[in-house]
Curated annotation (Swiss-Prot):
It comes from Komagataella pastoris. Pathway: Carbohydrate degradation; glycolysis; pyruvate from D-glyceraldehyde 3-phosphate: step 1/5. It is an enzyme of class 1 (oxidoreductase). The gene is GPD. NAD(+) binds at residues 12-13, 34, 79, 315. SUPFAM superfamilies: Glyceraldehyde-3-phosphate dehydrogenase-like, C-terminal domain, NAD(P)-binding Rossmann-fold domains. It holds the Pfam family Gp_dh_C. The active site is at 151 (nucleophile). GO terms for cellular component: cytosol. This is Glyceraldehyde-3-phosphate dehydrogenase.
């Protein structure tokens, strides 16, 4: 029986989640809600993508629906989720991808509107967070609202888990060199809470805060309080990279670390954690479905217990793939 899905928020993640969902035989997206996007424009935005290129199938719009390869999807334009007729549309699961309704209280509106469960595509202050490949097995069916954490946490957590499980992490600092996102400015503009964040995205390297490293402690409790980090926003359109510098409890060699991560990428974490020794750059990972691709030739070691590890991620497509994976896991529980 198909998993019937509604998507709230048809931005970067919402549209890519739809692309991924359309490739899964057990998922049927029946409705989209976005108060700022009419059906005809939704069809256009889905079909044409400057980063991931045009959708190869047939896309059209008629009335309040869009049609993708013969599959009809109803488009709603409600500002308040409680007014979205999810129940009438037959939606059981909602992907909350507006970046607005990220708390239990906010996401509950979807359930009040007729949905059964909600997956939030952002970190949450109070909803339980799950990272596929790290802690999704802890999900229980009584949890109706869950968070897929952030794209950066999805990159960092699998790597941190493998390293911690084998060598133990005493403490660590993370830097993510992160591509531009929609919240940034095309030219200098007002940004009262984050002055640097108001500067031109395409012409600056912008230091920023991130809770991604601390969030790892929520999905890997034994690392709680042991990791923190920061971000640099850089003028690339997609694909980011994590720099994880850690003090290890157990002394080792960089070759042994590489071997352990490679084994994990070919075993339980295959499809989530990747491994490469090639001389790669960011654009080589556009469209990569994996959460984290360890760059074996980019890391360095200073002492037997102090190392810097580098891992790439498509912060749009890889993350959207994990959203759909988590949705499937929730539906099967």
């Amino acid at each position: 029986m198909a998993i019937t899905v509604g998507i709230n928020g048809f931005g970067r993640i919402g549209r890519l989640v739809l692309r991924v969902a359309l490739s899964r035989a057990d998922i049927k997206v029946v409705a989209i809600n976005d108060p700022f996007i009419a059906p005809e424009y939704a069809a256009y935005m889905f079909k044409y993508d400057s980063t991931h290129k045009a959708y190869k199938g047939e896309v059209s719009a008629s009335g309040n629906k869009i049609n993708i390869d013969g599959k009809e999807i109803t488009v709603f334009q409600e500002r308040d989720p409680v007014n979205i007729p999810w129940g009438k549309a037959g939606v059981d699961y909602v992907i909350e991808s507006t970046g607005v309704f990220t708390t239990l209280e906010g996401a509950q509106k979807h359930i009040d509107a007729g949905a059964k469960k909600v997956v939030i595509t952002a970190p949450s202050k109070d909803a339980p967070m799950f990272v596929v490949g790290v802690n999704e097995e802890k999900y229980t069916s009584d949890l109706n609202i869950v968070s897929n954490a952030s794209c950066t946490t999805n990159c960092l957590a699998p790597l941190a888990k493998v390293v911690n499980d084998t060598f133990g992490i005493e403490s660590g600092l993370m830097t993510t060199v992160h591509s531009m996102t929609a919240t940034q400015k095309t030219v200098d503009g007002p940004s009262h809470k984050d002055w640097r964040g108001g500067r031109t995205a395409s012409g600056n390297i912008i230091p920023s805060s991130t809770g991604a490293a601390k969030a790892v402690g929520k999905v890997i409790p034994e690392l709680n309080g042991k990791l923190t980090g920061l971000a640099f926003r850089v003028p690339t359109v997609d694909v980011s990279v994590v720099d994880l510098t850690v003090n290890l409890k157990k002394e080792t060699t960089y070759e042994e670390i590489k071997s352990v991560i490679k084994a994990a990428s070919e075993g339980k974490l295959k499809g989530v954690l990747g491994y490469t020794e090639d001389a790669v750059v960011s654009s080589d990972f556009l469209g990569d479905e994996r959460s984290s691709i360890f760059d074996a030739s980019a890391g360095i070691q200073l002492t037997p217990s102090f190392v810097k590890l580098i891992s790439w991620y498509d912060n749009e497509y890889g993350y959207s793939t994990r959203v759909v994976d988590l949705l499937q896991h929730v539906a099967k529980a």
